[in-house]
């Protein structure tokens, strides 16, 4: 039986510490659950008063809009979306001036730099946290991707200069997303990032279109990704490329606050 309330701690010396807080309380949503009552019960179990490295997370299907009022009243915000693209979804045309090539081991420094740009931009939106060792752990993880026996990472180029990077986890590396996939086999689009001075040039679209072509030809039925919902770049971008929201991660960080915050107040604003 699935545990409704859970708590996990992430070691600070790990890449996982970049993707969220070190201490995470989770409430597992289930169909038909009494979410308002569960949220009330959960409040008494939470720890980490005013600790920014704690968070309370509830992941609900994006179409479950009835869950939103209770979550808002408890001070939660929708920060992350798990989105999905089904195979064969049409994509926008590729800009001709952007070239693309597979990344190699010789590109590891560039790949780390481009991934760090994404980490730093996404850190504004409540979940991602750059740590002192983030670059070191990204280097290890990206080296593993480059060592796979198939192409999984590509660079977008302006002239000969890399300005963007995308990599995917093919089905054999995407099993950890099993519960979120609506079709099989499924892959996970793990990273897309473009250098700040090259955003809006089409580099991201070229990389995405190429990755989708590779995945479709490989027979991948579903591609999943995470994106920051408040990010003004990623949200419109992914939906213009055929993705649709499937699950929304509602977050309160810190998990406990000495002040409840504006979103937790029930009073209506003064309309006079």
Which positions does each model-derived feature cover?
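Conserved donor-binding loop and adjoining core beta-sheet/short helix segment
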Residues: 1-42, 163-185
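A short beta-loop-alpha structural element at the N-terminal edge
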Residues: 99-114
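Acyl-donor-binding surface of acyltransferase catalytic domains
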Residues: 29-97, 247-255
């Amino acid at each position: 039986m699935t545990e409704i309330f859970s708590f996990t701690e992430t070691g600070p010396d790990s890449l996982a510490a970049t993707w969220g807080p070190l201490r995470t309380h989770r409430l597992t949503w289930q169909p038909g659950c009494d979410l308002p009552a569960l949220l009330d019960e959960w409040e008494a179990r939470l720890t980490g008063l005013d600790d920014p490295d704690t968070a309370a997370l509830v992941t609900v299907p994006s179409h479950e809009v009835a869950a939103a009022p209770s979550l808002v009243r408890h001070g939660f915000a929708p920060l992350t979306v798990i989105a999905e693209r089904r195979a064969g979804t049409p994509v926008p045309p590729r800009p001709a001036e952007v070239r693309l090539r597979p990344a190699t081991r010789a590109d590891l420094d560039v790949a780390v730099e481009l991934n760090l740009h994404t980490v730093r931009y996404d850190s504004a939106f409540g979940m991602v946290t750059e740590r002192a060792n983030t670059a070191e752990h990204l280097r290890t993880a990206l080296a593993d991707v480059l060592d796979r026996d198939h192409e999984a990472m590509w660079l977008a180029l302006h002239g000969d200069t890399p300005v963007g990077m995308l990599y995917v986890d093919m089905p054999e590396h995407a099993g950890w997303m099993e519960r979120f996939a609506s079709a099989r086999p499924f892959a996970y689009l793990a990273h897309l990032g473009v250098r700040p001075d090259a955003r809006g040039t089409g580099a991201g679209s070229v990389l995405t279109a190429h990755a989708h072509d590779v995945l479709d030809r490989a027979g991948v039925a579903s591609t999943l990704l995470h994106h920051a919902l408040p990010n003004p770049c990623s949200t419109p971008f992914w939906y213009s490329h055929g993705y649709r929201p499937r699950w929304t991660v509602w977050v309160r960080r810190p998990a406990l606050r000495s002040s409840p915050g504006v979103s937790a107040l029930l009073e209506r604003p003064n309309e006079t």
